């Protein structure tokens, strides 16, 4: 993982900036590597967003239970935008879009991991929708153990899809989370505290 940075504020259009305008060719650009706790604190601003974050943490727990504990996740979609006040939408987000880049556990193959947790690797649109409805995560898993050519192709695809809004074509940023489970329990505690109005 690259060094962690602070989550940049939404711009006037309610999207994350894709680059640091003051240093446009610096490494401080999307996908911004951020801590899971910062992610939870920043986006747990409504009951619906808390539900989605809970689903994301549950999805990560399922990945960890399947042995996928090394890698990173790209998070994007309407969840990363201030859609509640956007004139074109003015609604809460429905889910969070997540691409998970993962290392297979030692001695495991893609086939054995998928056989042990088939719901995490949907092969049909219906299975994908079932996963999304369960976790409120539009999930796309990608193994880091495949060919270099495929990894570059998939990374370029998702950066191209997520680097712009689909309806306005405006350039936007997104975030990167470490897949390791070390921060999940603290992040869940923060989310619970936010949900109950307590102090973590």
Which residues does each PLM region occupy?
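Catalytic core of pol beta-like nucleotidyltransferases
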Residues: 1-93, 102-200
């Amino acid at each position: 993982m690259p060094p962690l940075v602070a989550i940049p504020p939404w711009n006037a259009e309610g999207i994350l900036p894709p680059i640091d305008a003051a240093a446009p060719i610096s490494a401080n650009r999307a996908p911004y590597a951020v801590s899971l706790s910062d992610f939870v604190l920043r986006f747990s601003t409504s009951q619906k967003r808390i539900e989605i974050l809970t689903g994301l943490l549950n999805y990560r727990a399922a990945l960890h239970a399947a042995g996928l504990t090394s890698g990173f996740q790209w998070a994007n979609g309407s969840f990363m935008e201030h859609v509640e006040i956007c004139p074109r939408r003015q609604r809460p987000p429905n889910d969070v879009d997540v691409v998970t880049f993962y290392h297979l556990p030692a001695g495991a193959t893609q086939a054995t991991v998928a056989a042990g947790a088939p719901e995490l690797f949907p092969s049909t649109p219906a299975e994908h929708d079932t996963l999304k409805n369960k976790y409120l995560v539009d999930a796309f898993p990608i193994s880091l153990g495949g060919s270099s050519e495929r990894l570059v192709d998939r990374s370029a695809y998702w950066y191209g899809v997520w680097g712009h809004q689909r309806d306005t074509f405006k350039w936007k940023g997104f975030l990167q989370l470490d897949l390791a489970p070390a921060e999940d329990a603290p992040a869940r505690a923060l989310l619970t505290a936010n949900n109950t109005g307590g102090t973590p």
